[in-house]
Amino acid sequence: MDTLTDRQREILELIRRSVAERGYPPTRAEICQSLGFRSPNAAESHLRALARKGAIEMRRGASRGIRLTDAFAGAAPEPSPATDDPNAGLPVVGRVAAGSPLLAEESIERYCQVDASLFSPPADYLLRVRGESMRDAGILDGDLLAVRRDTEARDGQIVVVRLHDEVTVKFLERCNGVLRLIPAHPDYPVIEVAADGQDAVLEGIGVGVLRSPLDPRGPEGNAASD
């Protein structure tokens, strides 16, 4: 494994801290601001060096398309459920505080005794849906959407996206540098954001849906809005 320079270690630690505290990596602009680079090109050069040394993986065309590899992620645990019990089941994410990771302790309503491997790929958590914007895809108000945490998705997949301080569930489509978040209901508008901007952060992909009587709906079900 190649040795990292002091500057590369600083960037790696910044990425670790961002993932641990916010649930997603920094943008190039944020790296520049934090470490005093004059140009995003300087940050890009160091990121490419980190990728060559196996410390990170980079996804082209995404401002936050940086992922720590397993060998270097140890010092930056991702936000974890509020229990260490492996038999607790999948966390049910309800009300999400502005600026908090989805799996922050205060966002978890409870745990649902569902085997993650029932879904393909296996789910990491259940997100309580609010609203009818995905009605025609069979995702109703109060349903629990099984979500696989990921920073990449294909066109046509159901995705969980953070828009500023809101979390939404939509179909994904890319077109000419624009991310189109498409509802499955004729009364709701398509949301468009720049693919390389900071307005939208992909939190995961939908891999299944649960509804009553397996998991009763509660009064606080308002995680994913229209």
Swiss-Prot record:
Top EC class, one word: hydrolase
Superkingdom of origin: Bacteria
Enzyme Commission designation: 3.4.21.88
Stored Gene3D superfamilies: Umud Fragment, subunit A, Winged helix-like DNA-binding domain superfamily/Winged helix DNA-binding domain
Residues at the catalytic site: S133 (for autocatalytic cleavage activity), K170 (for autocatalytic cleavage activity)
GO terms, biological process: DNA repair; DNA replication; negative regulation of DNA-templated transcription; proteolysis; SOS response
Residues within the DNA-binding region(s): 28-48
Family assignment from sequence similarity: Belongs to the peptidase S24 family.
Family matches, as HAMAP family: LexA
Subunit structure as annotated in this protein's UniProt entry: Homodimer.
Annotated protein name in UniProt: LexA repressor
Species the sequence originates in: Halorhodospira halophila (strain DSM 244 / SL1)
Gene that this polypeptide is encoded by: lexA
